[in-house]
């Protein structure tokens, strides 16, 4: 349910997916969650997908965007996996060593353009001032995705930990979950660090992370009488199941 919303697995506006593509995309996600694929590997499979959106269902991630431009891919990927709403203006918050302009090459080659064309001879300047020259035979998309999903990139793990916390409690340790900024600090930095360390140490195992959250003292504590309850919107699937249970009509 949550993943379907995040990955826009639907054929209605604003997605541009055919119904058959949606079914294949949903099945791809279902199989990964059923097999408990590590989060980093699932994201790599998603972002490195190419080819037919029926034979390679994860390609629907890219096809679902209204604006299929390098900038839009960039902003949406960083919003989803790094929690950054405005990476174009604040690229330093997303990349520790890579600048925005220096990561456009691979996005210009996803599915739509010639992946074998020669890269432009631009300079790549790292955060420490080191200047690198693009290598012609480098797969820039793979380089970016491997950096994004690596355990060294803690933000990638932190954002997933925070999403799961939000799904359980209705409010993230960083709230909103998609708004990671210098002036939007975690409400409990130690809890976020502890869960992130656990998530990385267990090879991005999402089931173990969810289990740890559900067994936490926070989740199992009684609510304070004067405490504030955080209302949560029911997902569409839960509403449908509730109506089916009441009416006895499941088809």
Model-derived features: positions:
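Short, structured secondary-structure elements
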Residues: 1-132, 138-146, 150, 155-200, ...
């Amino acid at each position: 349910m949550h993943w379907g919303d995040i990955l826009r697995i639907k054929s209605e506006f604003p997605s541009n997916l055919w119904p058959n593509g949606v079914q294949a995309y949903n099945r791809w996600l279902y199989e990964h969650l059923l097999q408990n694929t590590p989060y980093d590997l699932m994201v790599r499979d998603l972002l490195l997908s190419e080819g037919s959106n029926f034979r390679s269902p994860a390609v629907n991630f890219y096809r679902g965007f209204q604006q299929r431009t390098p900038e839009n891919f960039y902003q949406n990927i960083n919003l989803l996996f790094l929690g950054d709403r405005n990476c174009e203006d604040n690229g330093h918050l997303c990349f520790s060593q890579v600048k925005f302009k220096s990561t456009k090459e691979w996005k210009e080659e996803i599915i739509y353009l010639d992946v074998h064309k020669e890269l432009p001879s631009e300079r790549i300047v790292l955060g420490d001032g080191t200047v690198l020259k693009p290598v012609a035979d480098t797969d820039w998309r793979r380089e970016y995705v491997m950096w994004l999903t690596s355990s060294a990139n803690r933000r990638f793990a932190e954002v997933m930990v925070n999403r799961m916390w939000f799904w359980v409690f209705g409010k993230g340790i960083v709230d909103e979950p998609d708004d990671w900024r210098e002036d939007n600090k975690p409400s409990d930095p130690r809890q976020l660090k502890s869960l992130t360390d656990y998530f990385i140490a267990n090879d991005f195992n999402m089931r173990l992370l969810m289990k740890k959250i559900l067994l936490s003292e926070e989740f199992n504590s009684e609510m304070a009488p004067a405490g504030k309850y955080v209302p949560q919107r029911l997902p569409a699937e839960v509403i449908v199941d509730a109506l089916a249970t009441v009416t006895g009509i499941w088809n």
